[in-house]
Each structure stands twice: as C-alpha cells, then as structure tokens.
A protein has these predicted regions:
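Phosphodiester-processing cores and adjacent nucleic acid-binding clamps
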Residues: 1-198
Length: 198
C-alpha cells in the first residue's frame, strides 16, 4: 500500500494504516523530519507530547524516543524537550546516528552521489546537501563524544535501550533479489503495458 497509494518521493503510510499493521513493529520518534520533532521545531511542545503519547499508546514498550546529535542547532534545541517528553510519558530513549555513509571520510563521496541523484552542480549553494560530515556509522566512543553533554548514567541507559531495541529485530536480506512491491495487473494489460500506463 505504501508503494501504490502513499508514495510521495518515497513509500509512506498514514497513522490509520500504521494502526492496522503495527503488530511486530518497533517505532521510534525519528530524526528532525519526524512528527514529534517537527512539532517541537514549530514550538508546539504540547502537540509533540500528544504525538509521542499517541505512538506510545499504539506501540507500548516498542516505542522509543530517539535522540540524535549531529552537531546541529535544531537538535541542540530539541533534545532537552525530547528527554523531558520521554520522562513525562515514561518512554524509553535510544540514541542513534542518521547514517548515510560508512565513515566520516566518505562524506564527500556521498555529497557527489547526491549531486548525481538530484542533477545538481556541486558548487550550487542552493542544492540539497548534508550540513556537515557527521552522518556516518559511529562507534560507541564516537557516540559518547557526540553526546558529551549527556550524563554517563543516561547515556548508558540509552545505549542499553538501543541494544534492546536492536535485539528485537530479525532481518535477513537476500542478496541479488530486489524486494520489489507486488501489484496486480488489471485485465487488458501486460506487465509492460501497465507499467507504461502508470
């Protein structure tokens, strides 16, 4: 359904569809683009808290407040409110890093790929780009450095919660077989003609 009905640049679903299919899923409040953080960025703490409560009501202990620190001002501004929401609603916190490349030194290669993907010139100041080179897979030590503002006890609790959430996951990726969405081909079409039609 996300591919066929909710597609907007990427597959997505609405809350009603999520309610229908939430069993067995783990949910986190997400990055700055997530619903909770978008409300905080708009200055609406009450709406952010209400949104977090709605997800907690649906997912129970499988809902987490996700903290990130990529040295961005918006994260520095909203992380304290996320922690406050987590404490007020008794939601476990996890720490993650939005990872778009393997190592810090891969940032320039990722930037070049973004230019190719978006057909942009690298010297265009208005093109989409990541604001810094912090979007890589970080070690626990690098995460501790990023979260140096957090006390040790809270940091270790967040690490444990992150590991607990990861341990609930069971994913097997079959290489060489792209997971394409299933769709029904209406009568009167072949696979090829229906693809051309849509």
């Amino acid at each position: 359904t996300a591919w066929c009905e909710g597609f907007y640049y990427k597959p997505r679903i609405n809350f009603e569809l999520l309610k229908e299919h939430h069993e067995g899923l783990i949910c986190a409040s997400a990055c700055l683009g997530g619903e909770v953080l978008q409300n905080l960025l708009k200055g609406d703490y009450a709406k952010a808290k209400e949104t977090a409560q709605r997800y907690k009501d649906l997912f129970g202990d499988d809902y987490y407040i996700e903290l990130q620190d990529h040295n961005l001002e918006d994260q520095k501004r909203t992380n304290p409110d996320l922690i406050k929401i987590a404490k007020e609603l008794n939601i476990k916190m996890i720490i993650t890093n939005d990872s778009h490349y393997l190592r810090r030194e891969d940032a320039d290669a990722q930037d070049t790929l973004l230019c190719l993907q978006t057909n942009a010139d690298k010297d265009d100041p208005n093109r989409f780009h990541f604001p810094n080179n912090e979007f890589y897979i970080k070690s626990k030590e690098a995460m501790r450095k990023a979260f140096s503002w957090m006390d040790d006890e809270t940091f270790e609790e967040c690490v444990k919660n992150t590991e607990d959430a990861a341990s609930k996951c069971n994913v097997e990726i079959e290489l060489g077989n792209a997971p394409l969405p299933h769709y029904d081909v209406p009568e009167g079409y072949t696979n090829e003609t229906y693809l051309q039609h849509i």
